Amino acid sequence: MAEFFDTPGGIALIILAQVLAVVAFVMISLLFLVYGDRKIWAAVQMRRGPNVVGVYGLLQSVADALKYVVKEVVIPAGADRTVFILAPMTSFVLAMIAWAVIPFNDGWVLSDINVAILYVFAVSSLEVYGVIMGGWASNSKYPFLGSLRSAAQMISYEVSIGLIIIGVILSTGSMNFGDIVRAQDTGWGFFGWYWLPHFPMVFLFFISALAETNRPPFDLPEAESELVAGYQVEYSATPFLLFMAGEYIAIFLMCALTSLLFFGGWLSPIPGLPDGVLWMVAKMAFFFFIFAMVKAITPRYRYDQLMRLGWKVFLPFSLVWVVFVAFAAKFDWFWGAFARWSVGG
């Protein structure tokens, strides 16, 4: 039996099992993310939230998913049918394949490539095409305006996210997530992670992640009061479910990136306690809680304010920070906090 797993067929079976494990984790997490998002929003508004289907309403997301699946897919008469159907599939698939390089523990990763950050950045940049396709194929002004807003917004904040990540790459000397996490394993626990030397960038990265994933207060592409529901106006049933799932998976991915880049990934915050996947999952859950709280308590930005914030505040500040980190790493300032090449690599 052991010899079988050394054959091409056995290796392919192992890879398939690993892929299915990651997909299962993301999809099960998705159900609880939607439930948690609704519960947190309800708690802030002093409501109960989902509480009927299952114990404490835990199966509400399953019921909603089944409802969307069994509904009829309605395609507008003037829509481009092929692109209309491909758009949500594109959005969902691109959100899923980004997880191929995300490690949950030391060695627990589908593809441990040296350019993992570049891969995630490339895939996340392509996600805007799903939104644009959906808005254009609907043949309606509201979806089209929403998709144009989304394109401008995602491109604007991708620049800042890229520059912030470059600062982390300069400190580590690697684009591999495993190397970045190991570079934060200094023996100081919570205070040895990158959030401390890169403290200003943590806030910029988090706010840019909100804009990148179209989350409140930056949900301009689907602003109900302005565009009805943006690029999702004409969608229903399974295509709408795929759009929504892709959006939440992208949010969860940003939570994972925040954990890996600045908060030690699977490392324990307390020296002496064992590291492991539970720390990684706990950190991702905590950052999603922050995402949900921001959605519940912040008013929506105006579109011109959103663009001004991205281009006139975040971009210059992140550019200056990259230059600062480059000098700090080169000349070993701040006791080597910005130059951990030997640790990470």
Curated annotation (Swiss-Prot):
It is found in: Cell inner membrane. It catalyses: a quinone + NADH + 5 H(+)(in) = a quinol + NAD(+) + 4 H(+)(out). Its main location: membrane. Its EC number is 7.1.1.-. GO terms for biological process: aerobic respiration. It is an enzyme of class 7 (translocase). Coiled coil: none annotated. The chain crosses the membrane at residues 14-34, 84-104, 115-135, 161-181, 187-207, 248-268, 277-297, 309-329. GO terms for cellular component: plasma membrane. It is a multi-pass membrane protein. Keywords: Cell inner membrane, Cell membrane, Membrane, NAD, Quinone, Translocase, Transmembrane, Transmembrane helix, Ubiquinone. GO terms for molecular function: NADH dehydrogenase activity; oxidoreductase activity, acting on NAD(P)H, quinone or similar compound as acceptor; quinone binding. NCBIfam families: PRK06076.1-2, PRK06076.1-6. Belongs to the complex I subunit 1 family. NDH-1 is composed of 14 different subunits. Subunits NuoA, H, J, K, L, M, N constitute the membrane sector of the complex. NDH-1 shuttles electrons from NADH, via FMN and iron-sulfur (Fe-S) centers, to quinones in the respiratory chain. The immediate electron acceptor for the enzyme in this species is believed to be ubiquinone. Couples the redox reaction to proton translocation (for every two electrons transferred, four hydrogen ions are translocated across the cytoplasmic membrane), and thus conserves the redox energy in a proton gradient. This subunit may bind ubiquinone. This is NADH-quinone oxidoreductase subunit H. It comes from Ruegeria pomeroyi (strain ATCC 700808 / DSM 15171 / DSS-3).
